[in-house]
Amino acid sequence: MRIVFMGTSHFAIPSLKALIASEHEIAGVVSQPDKQRGRGRKVTPTPVKEIAEQYKLELLQTANIKTPESIKRIKQWKPELIIVVSYGQIIPLSILEYPRHGCINVHASLLPRYRGAAPVQRALMDGIKSSGITIMFMDEGLDTGDIIMQEAIAVDDNINHGELEKILADMGADLLLQVVDRLVQGEKLPRVVQDDSQASYAARISKEDEIINWSEPAYAIHNRIRALNPQPGAYSYINGTKVKIFASKVRSEAGSGVIAEVIEVDKNTFQVQTGEGILEVLEIQKAGKKRMPTSEFLKGFTLHPGVLLGSKEG
């Protein structure tokens, strides 16, 4: 099978590597342009570009896949199938309809739930108990195409975004190869129309999403923290110092302190009163410093019960 692969983020890497290791031919790879990242604003290639260059695959990077030049380049590769995994742009109909087997997509949710750019993070914020992978035919909509195959997994209450995304990325690669192999064998793939009445949208994570609101229930804050671990991190302020919290634990007791108040501190951790219940902070990062267990943080940061979190002024 002659394939063009379109992807950008780390989530796409297992699928691309699985195709490289298979007997299928990768005619070309399409990815987003390099971007400035990190505190030093260093120009960094996309993860998919790095793999494409490592295996000496033909590569197209474009900020706009809809330009005549981009479309022409893809058609010159003469793909029989286009595979899209975490690419990041809406693909025009002129590309979607070009390959004789169409375009298929690996999506990190059980569609039609969590259509959009941040399905894993939004699902974790919602405290979902199960998630999964959908392989689908692509159309012009946002994750609205017919479903070929789905597989679900249980989601632990403490798993974070990075951990769950890796599991789903590996699962997606396995399911993708199954689908491509079925195509090669001449099998007609199923097409299950999505029920739009059951759809939900997973919008990109915003700056506002990163802010911890201590008036929320402890479980909701815990879900936000794990949804934003490892990036970008959920944050608050302690005595005017910005801190990101990467791991937490919901305590069983309700608590009777003031919302956002530190109600207990020991050498290993500290506990905060929320709008409903108590949250224990397990891993934290002071601005400009490395992530560390709360026990290490408290060795160099004085914190007493009664301090209120959330104020920039301290």
From Swiss-Prot:
TM region(s), chain numbering:
none
Which leading EC class covers this enzyme? transferase
Residue numbers binding (6S)-5,6,7,8-tetrahydrofolate: S109, L110, L111, P112
| CDD domains recorded | FMT_core_Met-tRNA-FMT_N, Met_tRNA_FMT_C
Keywords from the named record? Protein biosynthesis, Transferase
Q: Name one Pfam family in it.
A: Formyl_trans_N
GO cellular component terms given for this protein: cytosol
Per the record, what are the reactions this protein catalyses?
A: L-methionyl-tRNA(fMet) + (6R)-10-formyltetrahydrofolate = N-formyl-L-methionyl-tRNA(fMet) + (6S)-5,6,7,8-tetrahydrofolate + H(+)
Q: Does the keyword Transferase apply?
A: yes
EC nos: 2.1.2.9
Gene Ontology terms, MF aspect? methionyl-tRNA formyltransferase activity
The UniProt entry, under HAMAP family, shows: Formyl_trans
Q: Record's family?
A: Belongs to the Fmt family.
What functional role does this protein have?
Attaches a formyl group to the free amino group of methionyl-tRNA(fMet). The formyl group appears to play a dual role in the initiator identity of N-formylmethionyl-tRNA by promoting its recognition by IF2 and preventing the misappropriation of this tRNA by the elongation apparatus.
Protein name per its UniProtKB record? Methionyl-tRNA formyltransferase
Q: Which organism is it from?
A: Syntrophomonas wolfei subsp. wolfei (strain DSM 2245B / Goettingen)
